């Protein structure tokens, strides 16, 4: 009897350990099967306010409608409302959101203008600052290359003009001097013709 009691006591504690190990496995699998299918609520709220573009601010109901249409939040409306209220309250306390009207999770909400205005110029200034000096350097390089090319033909043109002006008076002066020298030579020719005419007339008179 004592041996059977010892065997029964040894077998009984082993069974619950195996059951406890099997029961622990499904809890780990359940945690892994719950991935978040949407961004954080504060990001969804900011996107909803930007897209709604209401000057007075977006209401909680309008934000909830936008979020449920554009994100996969599930079918549990009570849980979605609870998360949305918490996110709105935290956004106001952390100054990520501005409450334009109402109190708590009720009322209208906006995105701070300073944060939105600071992000847009910062993204716009960086490419503009990089592009402007490059364009200015190219323009100055082109101007420097073009200026000497334009100056060279001007110097050549002025040189040609000086040569032409110097040559033109020399050509006019030479023929004028030659014409003046030839005119007295032609006048001297008739004097030589008059002398032989007088000699021929004297000879026949001597023979008679």
From Swiss-Prot:
Task of the protein: Histones H1 are necessary for the condensation of nucleosome chains into higher-order structures. Probably does not act as global transcriptional repressor. Acting in concert with chromobox protein homologs hpl-1 and hpl-2, involved in reproduction, somatic gonad development, male tail development, and vulval cell fate decisions; perhaps as a result of modulating expression of Hox genes mab-5 and egl-5. Plays a role in linking epigenetic regulation with the innate immune response.
Gene Ontology terms: biological process: chromatin remodeling; chromosome condensation; defense response to Gram-positive bacterium; negative regulation of DNA recombination; negative regulation of gene expression; nucleosome assembly
InterPro entries the UniProt entry points to: H1/H5 (IPR005819), Histone_H1/H5_H15 (IPR005818), WH-like_DNA-bd_sf (IPR036388), WH_DNA-bd_sf (IPR036390)
Species for this entry: Caenorhabditis elegans
Region (Disordered): 101-208
GO molecular function: double-stranded DNA binding; histone H3K27me3 reader activity; nucleosomal DNA binding; structural constituent of chromatin
Gene Ontology CC: one annotated term: cytoplasm
Complex formation: Interacts with nmad-1. Interacts (when monomethylated at Lys-14) with chromobox protein homolog hpl-1; the interaction is direct. Interacts (when monomethylated at Lys-14) with histone H3 (when trimethylated on 'Lys-27'); the interaction is direct.
One Pfam family hit: Linker_histone
Gene3D superfamilies: Winged helix-like DNA-binding domain superfamily/Winged helix DNA-binding domain
Primary localization: nucleus
Processing after translation: Methylation at lysine 14 is necessary to regulate male tail development.
Source organism, top-level taxon: Eukaryota
Keyword tags: Acetylation, Chromosome, Cytoplasm, DNA-binding, Methylation, Nucleus
Descriptive protein name: Histone 24
SMART domains: H15
Family: Belongs to the histone H1/H5 family.
PTM sites of type N6-methyllysine: 14
